[in-house]
Swiss-Prot record:
Record-listed E.C. numbers: 2.5.1.75
Its biological purpose: Catalyzes the transfer of a dimethylallyl group onto the adenine at position 37 in tRNAs that read codons beginning with uridine, leading to the formation of N6-(dimethylallyl)adenosine (i(6)A).
NCBIfam families: miaA
KW Transferase (keyword) present: yes
UniProtKB keywords: ATP-binding, Magnesium, Nucleotide-binding, Transferase, tRNA processing
Gene name, Swiss-Prot/TrEMBL: miaA
Organism classification: Bacteria, Pseudomonadati, Pseudomonadota, Gammaproteobacteria, Alteromonadales
Annotated site location: Interaction with substrate tRNA: T103, R125
Protein name as annotated: tRNA dimethylallyltransferase
Positions of region (Interaction with substrate tRNA): 37-40, 161-165
Recorded family membership: Belongs to the IPP transferase family.
């Protein structure tokens, strides 16, 4: 690898072969894997997330697995903070950070940074709400046009919640919401080699998704979800339970879907997720594409990383 302080990222839709490639690379490079997956963070959710096995985790150190209970939340800002700290720690120990996953919101937070918007202030919000009742929404929207015309143009005049929030941000920060949104913080500044793994033909990805879903159902996945279903503190609106596969099995256990309906909807939802992932990847700069199943994939990655990261990322 040419750039010694570089980070490697392997993107890809679900069931594309990211895990296999990452483990193969770890045999050649002294890597530690940082999971970039919003479902793998949860304890007790192993089968439906295709979590790396204990054997795989023993072969290569994995990070950001099993760090939250399913009742808890984990934001893109949480990931950004944790990933940056892990990257520094891994490199300080002389190893290579390898980011692997398909949660594109997390990747975006890490690579582009996040906007730091002020938290809601009760006193400011109460004052603005009182003005809303006294002067009306049109007056507040007119005020927003003066201090933040871009937000005023974007926000519908009949949307009180967003108008109040935009004015609240301006009063707290002294800057318009538009300006604060453009200001990004916490982005990765180290060189990065980015690879995306996906089949050339969509039907191949669909076949792999269906095979993975059926493999999941052949394991005690129903029992895994039943354990979650039995917990009184969990409900279907939590991010953990909304995860693809878990949502549909939860509905099956609740009597809302038959087994066949659960399977069909789970496969469709996984395909839709993969489509969103592919759409994001096609628009992301600096990504080098690899075809799922290419026997020379690992060698192509190693060859590509002989270039300086700056040159690597300048190519389409």
């Amino acid at each position: 690898m040419h750039s010694k302080d570089a980070v490697i990222a392997i993107y890809g839709p679900t069931a594309s072969g990211k895990t296999a490639l990452s483990l193969a690379l770890c045999e050649q490079l002294d890597c530690e894997i940082i999971s970039v997956d919003s479902a793998l963070i949860y304890r007790g959710m192993d089968i439906g997330t295709a979590k790396p096995s204990a054997e795989e985790q023993n072969l290569v150190p994995h990070h950001l697995l099993d760090i939250r209970d399913p009742a808890e939340t984990y934001s893109a800002a949480d990931f950004q903070k944790d990933a940056l700290a892990l990257i520094d720690d891994i490199q300080q120990r002389g190893k290579v950070p390898l980011l692997v996953g398909g949660t594109m919101l997390y990747f975006k937070a890490l690579l582009e940074g996040l906007s730091h918007l002020p938290e809601s202030d009760t006193s400011v919000r109460e004052k603005l709400t009182a003005e809303l009742h006294e002067k009306g929404l049109a007056e507040l929207h007119s005020r927003l046009q003066k201090v933040d015309p871009t937000s005023a143009k974007r926000i519908h005049p009949n949307d009180p919640q967003r108008i109040l929030r935009a004015l609240e941000v301006y009063e707290i920060a002294g800057k318009p919401l538009t300006e604060l949104t453009r200001e990004r913080h916490g982005q990765l500044t180290k060189p990065i080699y980015q690879f995306a793994v996906a089949p050339v033909e969509r039907k191949v990805l669909h076949q792999r998704i269906e095979q993975r879903f059926d493999h999941m159902l052949a394991q005690p996945f129903k029992e895994e979800v039943a354990t979650l279903f039995a917990r009184p503190d969990l409900h279907p609106d939590l991010p953990s339970i909304r995860s693809v596969g878990y949502r549909q099995m939860w509905q099956h256990l609740a009597g809302e879907l038959s087994y066949d309906e659960m399977r069909e909807r789970g496969i469709i939802a996984t395909r839709q997720l993969a489509k969103r992932q592919m759409t994001w990847l096609r628009g992301w700069p600096g990504v080098h594409w690899l075809e799922t199943g290419d026997l020379n994939m690992q060698a192509k990655v190693m060859t590509a990383m002989q270039q300086p990261a700056k040159i690597f990322n300048s190519k389409d």
